[in-house]
């Protein structure tokens, strides 16, 4: 994978030192090459403001904000003493560069100033860190639980919080406790600074979800309505939370791969990619060219499958019933191809540390060539049925629109960002897995509205088909898995060669590989935007900290901005155009 440019190391670090004093920062070396700086909490807000708005080509995109419980970490060479570390990851799209800021906090009453005033996207991220780690953000407009239920005791991503049900008391839900839990979910407008009435009218408060079909999962949006007009909206997430990051601390590096399939569960093995690439970077594994191309081909098939589902449900939510049935037929053809060489449809867990699970079978290209000939005609038909439909255009053009600046302020990536006219695609900007060897275009929109978000994804399917065709025509020969001691599972044919290889195979399969200590963040252009895994290894067989940065999480945070002043029917189109699944949000 191409690393971020070194320009930020040459310019932004000295600039920060000049602005705040060289003795203020402590630099840390990480496996991903991103400039990582420790700084005191007292200059946090000013540093974020400086990076986001006071320099040329600013680091305006808050890619991630998370934390690490450092209390039982063994390998912290050269890092400041810290019980909890809060991590800020910012990206400059103009520089194509990243910077990572870290702040050390004590074990007792860990607290930081909130940066929401200078970076609106930090709102949910700070709430998540408070929810999961118990780190307080002073000055946050409404610091309350985000993922866990309001009545939850403790902070799950602390190391002293139980990781398994067997470590906790048996679960029971008496009637009185159930009533308390239900009451805790009641929406109280005053808690969100909302008025129940104005001079002219009494406002209506409506729960859209968590069981409404148009919210695409277990998800609630509490609406403040003046008649049919939306005055304000409060997205309520967490109903689909399964503790994916916590589980990463209790699974071996290899056995965690199936869990990644089920984050954006419509993206299938594409979810494996940033995770296995991150482990490979920590382990120093060079993946063979054939394996890289197989990964690209499978990822693009999953992109098409995911976009077909989006396309059909988008049309359905806006009022068309027929397209989704035809698109599901095409989606099944894609799954038939995927199943022919992975053995599974949606959750194949096909990627491995060091390569892929198996080589392509004999005659693997036949179904693909048939699909390449078939699919463009179907897309042309869908253009006539959906994109050219006057009802679709009236319902989606000018609805839920935002600018490029607003998208970056709210950490929007993927098709939602490109719909504003910015041609920023991670596969082009920072090619990984050999994407630099493929010819494809980056579709963009102009208005940043619901219609453009759909149009960008439709064109992306055509570009994915181009990439797949190049994979078929130029599939390299060679091994499908790296010859490396930490490749997992190791090549089976070596197990009976001698006792050393047999022992290595046994240990790798049972305990799992021992990955060297370090930190790394690897990001890909997933189906819904930028998907990244920030892994911390403490030199063991399991991850010390597994951070999953998903695109859908910040995208839902932007719903109030897009929906204020719109009608309830417009909100349905807005939700459909975002393209999210709740497992990708809640993790």
Swiss-Prot record:
Keywords: Cell inner membrane, Cell membrane, Membrane, Multifunctional enzyme, NAD, Quinone, Translocase, Transport, Ubiquinone. Residues 1-178 are annotated as: NADH dehydrogenase I subunit C. The keyword Cell membrane applies. It is a peripheral membrane protein. One of its GO terms (biological process) is respiratory electron transport chain. Its EC number is 7.1.1.-. Residues 202-587 are annotated as: NADH dehydrogenase I subunit D. Pfam families: Complex1_30kDa, Complex1_49kDa. Coiled coil: none annotated. One of its GO terms (molecular function) is quinone binding. It catalyses: a quinone + NADH + 5 H(+)(in) = a quinol + NAD(+) + 4 H(+)(out). GO terms for cellular component: plasma membrane; respiratory chain complex I. It is found in: Cell inner membrane. NCBIfam families: NuoC_fam (TIGR01961), NuoD (TIGR01962), PRK06075.1 (NF004739), PRK11742.1 (NF008728). In the N-terminal section; belongs to the complex I 30 kDa subunit family. In the C-terminal section; belongs to the complex I 49 kDa subunit family. NDH-1 is composed of 13 different subunits. Subunits NuoB, CD, E, F, and G constitute the peripheral sector of the complex. NDH-1 shuttles electrons from NADH, via FMN and iron-sulfur (Fe-S) centers, to quinones in the respiratory chain. The immediate electron acceptor for the enzyme in this species is believed to be ubiquinone. Couples the redox reaction to proton translocation (for every two electrons transferred, four hydrogen ions are translocated across the cytoplasmic membrane), and thus conserves the redox energy in a proton gradient. This is NADH-quinone oxidoreductase subunit C/D. It comes from Methylococcus capsulatus (strain ATCC 33009 / NCIMB 11132 / Bath). The lineage of its organism: Bacteria, Pseudomonadati, Pseudomonadota, Gammaproteobacteria, Methylococcales. The gene is nuoC.
């Amino acid at each position: 994978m191409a690393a971020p440019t070194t320009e930020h190391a040459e310019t932004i670090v000295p600039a920060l030192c000049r602005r705040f004093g060289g003795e203020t920062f402590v630099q840390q070396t990480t496996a991903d090459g991103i400039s990582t700086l420790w700084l005191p909490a007292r200059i946090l807000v000013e540093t974020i403001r400086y990076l986001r708005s006071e320099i040329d080509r600013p680091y305006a995109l808050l890619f991630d904000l998370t934390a690490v419980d450092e209390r039982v970490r063994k390998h912290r060479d050269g890092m400041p003493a810290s019980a909890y570390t809060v991590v800020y990851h910012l990206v400059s799209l103009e520089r194509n560069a990243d910077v990572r800021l870290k702040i050390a906090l004590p074990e007792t009453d860990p607290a930081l100033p909130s940066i929401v005033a200078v970076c609106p996207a930090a709102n949910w991220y700070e709430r998540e860190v408070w929810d999961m780690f118990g780190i307080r953000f002073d000055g946050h407009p409404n610091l309350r639980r985000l993922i866990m239920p309001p009545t939850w005791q403790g902070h799950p991503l602390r190391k002293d919080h139980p990781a398994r049900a067997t470590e906790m008391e048996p679960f029971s839900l008496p009637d009185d406790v159930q009533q308390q839990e239900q009451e805790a979910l009641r929406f109280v407008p005053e808690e969100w600074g909302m008025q129940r009435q104005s001079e002219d009218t009494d406002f209506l408060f409506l729960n859209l979800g968590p069981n409404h079909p148009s919210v695409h999962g277990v998800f609630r949006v509490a609406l403040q309505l003046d008649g049919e007009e939306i005055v304000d909206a409060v997205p309520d997430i967490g109903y689909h939370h399964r503790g994916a990051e916590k589980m990463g601390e209790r699974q071996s590096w290899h056995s965690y791969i199936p869990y990644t399939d089920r984050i954006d569960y419509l993206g299938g093995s594409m979810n494996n990619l940033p995770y296995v690439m991150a482990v490979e970077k920590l382990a120093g594994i060079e993946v063979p060219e054939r394996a890289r191309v197989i990964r690209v081909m499978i990822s693009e098939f999953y992109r098409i499958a995911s976009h077909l589902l989006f396309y059909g449900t988008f049309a359905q939510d806006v009022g068309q019933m027929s397209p989704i049935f035809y698109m599901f037929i095409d989606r099944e053809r894609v799954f038939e191809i995927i199943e022919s060489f992975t053995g599974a449809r949606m959750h194949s867990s096909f990627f491995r540390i060091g390569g892929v699970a198996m080589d392509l079978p004999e005659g693997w290209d036949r179904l693909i060539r048939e699909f390449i000939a078939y699919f463009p005609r179907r897309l042309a038909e869908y253009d006539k049925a959906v994109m050219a439909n006057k009802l679709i255009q009236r319902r989606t053009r000018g609805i839920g629109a935002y600018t490029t600046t607003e998208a970056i302020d709210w950490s929007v990536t993927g098709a939602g960002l490109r719909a504003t006219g910015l041609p920023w695609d991670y596969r082009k900007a920072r090619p990984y897995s050999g994407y630099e060897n493929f010819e494809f275009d980056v579709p963009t929109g102009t208005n940043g509205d619901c219609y453009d978000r759909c149009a960008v994804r439709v064109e992306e399917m055509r570009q994915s088909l181009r990439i797949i065709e190049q994979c078929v025509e130029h599939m390299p020969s060679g091994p499908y898995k790296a010859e490396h001691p930490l490749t997992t599972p190791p090549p089976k044919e070596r197990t009976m060669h001698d006792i050393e290889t047999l022992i290595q195979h046994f240990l790798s399969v049972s305990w799992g590989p021992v990955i060297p200590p370090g930190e790394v963040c690897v990001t890909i252009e997933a189906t819904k935007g930028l998907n990244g895994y920030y892994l911390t290894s403490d030199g063991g067989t399991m991850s010390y900290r597994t951070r999953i940065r998903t695109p859908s999480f910040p995208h839902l945070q932007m719903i109030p901005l897009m929906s204020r002043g719109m009608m309830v029917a417009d909100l349905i189109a807005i939700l459909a155009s975002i393209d999210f699944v709740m497992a990708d949000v809640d993790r």
